[in-house]
From Swiss-Prot:
A GO term, aspect molecular function: alpha-ribazole phosphatase activity
Name of the protein: Adenosylcobalamin/alpha-ribazole phosphatase
List of catalytic residues: H8, E81
Enzyme class: hydrolase
Catalysed reactions listed for this entry: adenosylcob(III)alamin 5'-phosphate + H2O = adenosylcob(III)alamin + phosphate; alpha-ribazole 5'-phosphate + H2O = alpha-ribazole + phosphate
Organism: Escherichia coli (strain K12)
EC numbers: 3.1.3.73
Gene designation per UniProt: cobC
GO CC annotation, single: cytoplasm
Length: 203
């Protein structure tokens, strides 16, 4: 089984450096172009299944990547980005002034401190682990497209290849690229990270 991983296209929140977990943040013109280019790059891959975050920026990306393919998109809430609570759509400079104590605590211990009224890393990582546990449901598929977010995909890669959850920051998943992980019964192999080449099955 191969997972083809795609991060949603660029949003204005990405440009502005805002925390955007669950807040609605539509794709920019560049984000749309990134997804359309991925449609071209991955046109030769025969996807059996599409799994996507329930957030619109990811779903829009999935629709553009699939384009004219008649493939249903299965919405998976576990693929949603981390929820930043009161910090949604806010810049770190503002949080340093307006929620200084909690934001400082989170910066110093992001694994245990929790964004104000948001989702802590422990809950977030457990949610991604639930998705990993579900992968056995899809083992009869060959090529699965997964459309999600930076945090989720970084954590997913780390955990699938046997690294601890806190190692997720070793993997930056860029927009406008595709990555691939092969999974067999014993282990997973990161085959490709952040490629802008034409995708080829079984390569």
């Amino acid at each position: 089984m191969r997972l083809w991983l795609i991060r949603h296209g660029e949003t204005q929140a990405n440009i502005d450096g805002l925390y955007s977990g669950h807040a609605p943040t539509p794709l920019t013109a560049r984000g749309i172009e990134q997804a359309q280019n991925l449609h071209t790059l991955l046109h030769g891959v025969s996807f059996d299944l599409v799994l996507c975050s329930e957030l619109e920026r990811a779903q829009h990306t999935a629709r553009l990547v699939l384009s004219d393919r008649q493939l249903p998109v299965q919405i998976i809430p576990e693929l949603n980005e981390m929820f930043f609570g009161d910090w949604e759509m806010r810049h770190h400079r503002d949080l340093m002034q307006e929620d200084a104590e909690n934001y400082s605590a989170w910066c110093n211990d992001w694994q245990h401190a929790i964004p104000t009224n948001g989702e802590g890393f422990q809950a977030f990582s457990q949610r991604v682990e639930r998705f990993i546990a579900r992968l056995s449901e899809f083992q009869h598929y060959q090529n699965i497209l997964v459309v999600s977010h930076q945090g989720v995909l970084s954590l997913l890669i780390a955990r699938l290849i046997g690294m601890p959850a806190e190692a997720m920051w070793h993997f930056r998943v860029d927009q406008g690229c595709w990555s691939a992980i092969d999974i067999n019964q014993k282990f997973a192999t990161l085959r490709v990270l952040n490629s802008r080449a034409i995708g080829v099955e079984n390569a």
